[in-house]
Amino acid sequence: MRRRPQARTTQPYSSGENMETVESMLIDISTLRAATGGFADSNKLGEGGFGAVYKGNLPDGDEIAVKRLAKSSTQGVGELTNELLLVAKLQHKNLVRLVSVCLEQEERLLVYEFVPNRSLDQVLFDTEKRGQLDWGKRYKIISGIARGLQYLHEDSQLKVVHRDLKASNVLLDTNMNPKISDFGLARLFGGDQTQGVTSRVVGTYGYMAPEYVMRGNYSVKSDVFSFGVMVLEIVTGKKNNDCYTSRLSEDLLTLVWEHWTAGSVSELIDPCLGDGFSRTDAQRCMHIGLLCTQGDPAGRPAMSSVVMMLGSDTVSLQAPPKPVSYARRNGSGTSSTMSTASA
């Protein structure tokens, strides 16, 4: 796995346990070639810096998604290994399930359960598909992501910081239940460790917490920030990073804050939701999103608290402080700075 220059974490499991984990999940390359039609383009679900993901069908009828590391990739080997060792030890209904692994003939492949509705961003930000997400489904997605993060941060045998939580890394099953995926950048915390530091900041602009972008500091509260951004996106149907890829002058956090202070935040609720739902619940979710995206990591709620806030409207919420706002990228495409949203 990639070395961190500081705060190196002691692994909570031994290399011998790692080997046993890998060996127990091995599958042969011939089975995967047959399942994916020889990794046919027609079965390709998507592609990233690590390589491609293919849909496949095993002989027993199970549908799978095969993540294949590109042979030309240099940085992906460590991330693939990291993902394998992490996900194999994590079991939760709101995390994507690792089925097996193949390490034959210079191939490096991770085999996951197939999640039919693809990623959240492909539905939420598609003008035709977003109508499939009524308020009940959106609330279920928000709550499911929260429970998955609570498990990673507090309830699993490992304490895991995802570091790349975003709409494209949340998959939706047949019933639109969310499953957090892509653990290539995730990090383990051992013992009493509460944060890590890295000189190589990786992630997606618009979802990364300010302390991570500016100083390389990451913790469970970095994931809480990313979750808050996603909550605001799910309620409004707007991308936070639109202002970095278009001529929009302000990001979603600033927009929500301006409407919050003006008492008009309900105007930002996705209009495709219509009127047959509780706008109060939607506004409460936006309130939670603002609490999660405040600049001070210590002020952001733990995910267990977020789950409680979502589970009962009798849990009182404190007034949200000004969220962190990303200044718009300049015309040359260079990195922009972060600031605090103004009222």
Where are the regions that the model predicts?
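Conserved eukaryotic protein kinase-like
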Residues: 1-343
